């Protein structure tokens, strides 16, 4: 006769969950569970303490106003407005809708340069009307409230200011673009030491307090088609004046206005796509084939009749 299979499983999983005889939950008494809880509480508490401590030590070595390591920061890039998709500005003189986005881009950039926002009890100060030397305002590390910033008057951009022509020349087929150097904290741009190494068009107007900018046709055959290019900036100079540098960062100069240069193409050949390259010149301005915006930018312009 076959032996009957024992059906006694010792209580099974129910007894494992709660053993009333031994007063155990999941195989452990209350005292055992308490010891385990205290152990892990202390263990993870120590881990959290070590983590928080290392973070605190690291924060003590970091300035609230200046990055600790800046040796790999590249020289500033040169950017422009209006921002164009695939760097292409294409519009029709007879169709205002075709250049509406370009005009709105310029308005968005220049709205902070309105004179009303630079008047009254503000951190702005007059730094002259002609280019001058750097204006230093103490160490970056010190926090003494907001540091003063130089005013930049919209009227200096003349035809590209939008004051007299709200279309910035687009309605007449004479488009404007606004160039600016990207902000780098604590950067002192160095102008060319002399004008002999500059393009011939810049040599006559060399200024020791300005980083000049120059635009020209990318292709030799486009030089005649591009025609005359006019530059508008502080003191009538097409470049970036030194008194707006160095930049102290958003925490100390949240109202900082970087200098701008208005560039207007006054007699472009219509119905032809023209490729233009603009470069800023300085002793510590670099250019790179890998980064096409480093010290320069390219833009394609097509004015349709």
UniProtKB/Swiss-Prot annotation:
Belongs to the X(+)/potassium ATPases subunit beta family. It holds the Pfam family Na_K-ATPase. It is found in: Cell membrane. The chain crosses the membrane at residues 33-53. Keywords: Cell membrane, Disulfide bond, Glycoprotein, Ion transport, Membrane, Potassium, Potassium transport, Signal-anchor, Sodium, Sodium transport, Sodium/potassium transport, Transmembrane, Transmembrane helix, Transport. This is Sodium/potassium-transporting ATPase subunit beta-1. It is a single-pass type II membrane protein. InterPro entries: Na/K_ATPase_sub_beta, Na/K_ATPase_sub_beta_sf. Disulfide bonds join 127-150, 160-176, 215-278. It comes from the Eukaryota. This is the non-catalytic component of the active enzyme, which catalyzes the hydrolysis of ATP coupled with the exchange of Na(+) and K(+) ions across the plasma membrane. The beta subunit regulates, through assembly of alpha/beta heterodimers, the number of sodium pumps transported to the plasma membrane. It comes from Tetronarce californica. The sodium/potassium-transporting ATPase is composed of a catalytic alpha subunit, an auxiliary non-catalytic beta subunit and an additional regulatory subunit. Glycans are attached at residues 114, 159, 194, 267. Residues 1-32 are cytoplasmic. GO terms for biological process: intracellular potassium ion homeostasis; intracellular sodium ion homeostasis; potassium ion import across plasma membrane; sodium ion export across plasma membrane.
